[in-house]
Amino acid sequence: MNTIEKPTEKAEILLEALPYIRRFYNRTVVIKYGGHAMVDDELKQSFAKDVLMMKYIGINPVVVHGGGPQIGSFLKKLGKDSKFIQGMRVTDEETMNIVEMVLVGKVNKEIVGLINHAGGKAVGLSGKDGSLIRAEKYYLSAEKAKDTPPEIIDIGLVGKVKEINADLITSLVRDGFIPVIAPTGAGDSGETYNINADIVAGAIAAALKAEKLILLTDVAGVLNKQGELINTMNNMEALEMIHEGVIEGGMFPKVKCCMKSLREGVRKAHIVDGRLKHAILLEMFTDKGIGTELVL
């Protein structure tokens, strides 16, 4: 009995995935890879296999990675504190040098190696390579008293995306490569900017008119006041939760970049739990999916 049921169950799982494989064939999916999924060995292997499977069945994955824990660990070893405002890392010149060294020189190469070892053709890029990401300085704003202008906060060499060289990514994808992108960018005067990886992923997804933007994080998705998972959330609901302070910290730029990417042509955006093995496949190829789906 069991010997018959088990193969049958596997067949049913494959059949459940079939309409999604058909729907996403030859479409681009941008994945922001970050959090616990980057430091747990089992999850790293799971991620590489998910990306490889997508490529094998005709989907075009583009990976944008973070590296916050690795940067924080390196800064700590050097006796330098990490400071965050509204989920953004305050970045002076010394910190920027460390950020670039860790993101581009270490983390990016490790991810490329993981995917290639699994059988893929990954190529690593920073935003400075081939003028992939043109950036400009980013300032935060904080609301003050009613009827007074917001406070402008300078957080150093933190940038925002000015322009994406989509042709470079498209060319690599067309040649069978899986682009793996570190979130740094170059300013007009040649200065290097640290850019939030979620924001970079959203901008790249918009530039490519991607089918999906998937952000991997260390929580189940977007949570309500009671700490319960929100399965689907629209733009108005997101704005209300931001105003009420329910969406804050590191989740704030994630939700913000998802909504911006949707307005700029991305079909769907998802914030999912990267602590789950095969989180990407569960989101893309099952009826229920996981995490929070964001819509306009």
UniProtKB/Swiss-Prot annotation:
GO BP annotations of the record are: arginine biosynthetic process via ornithine; L-arginine biosynthetic process
Recorded source organism is: Syntrophus aciditrophicus (strain SB)
Q: Which GO terms describe its molecular function?
A: acetylglutamate kinase activity; ATP binding
Show the InterPro entries listed in the entry.
AceGlu_kinase-like_sf (IPR036393), AcgluKinase_fam (IPR004662), ArgB (IPR037528), Asp/Glu/Uridylate_kinase (IPR001048), Glu/AcGlu_kinase (IPR001057), NAGK-C (IPR041727)
Task: Please explain the role this protein plays, according to its UniProt record.
Answer: Catalyzes the ATP-dependent phosphorylation of N-acetyl-L-glutamate.
User: What would be one Pfam family of this protein?
Assistant: AA_kinase
Subcellular location per the Swiss-Prot or TrEMBL entry? Cytoplasm
Top EC class for this record: transferase
- Which keywords label this protein? Amino-acid biosynthesis, Arginine biosynthesis, ATP-binding, Cytoplasm, Kinase, Nucleotide-binding, Transferase
The EC number of this protein is 2.7.2.8
Q: Where is this site: Transition state stabilizer?
A: 32, 254
The lineage's top-level taxon is Bacteria
User: Family per UniProt?
Assistant: Belongs to the acetylglutamate kinase family. ArgB subfamily.
> Any idea what this protein is called?
Acetylglutamate kinase
Q: Which GO terms describe its cellular component?
A: cytoplasm
Q: Where does substrate bind?
A: 67-68, 89, 194
This enzyme catalyses: N-acetyl-L-glutamate + ATP = N-acetyl-L-glutamyl 5-phosphate + ADP
Its pathway, per UniProt, is: Amino-acid biosynthesis; L-arginine biosynthesis; N(2)-acetyl-L-ornithine from L-glutamate: step 2/4
Decide whether keyword Transferase is in the record.
yes
Give the chief site where it resides. Answer: cytoplasm
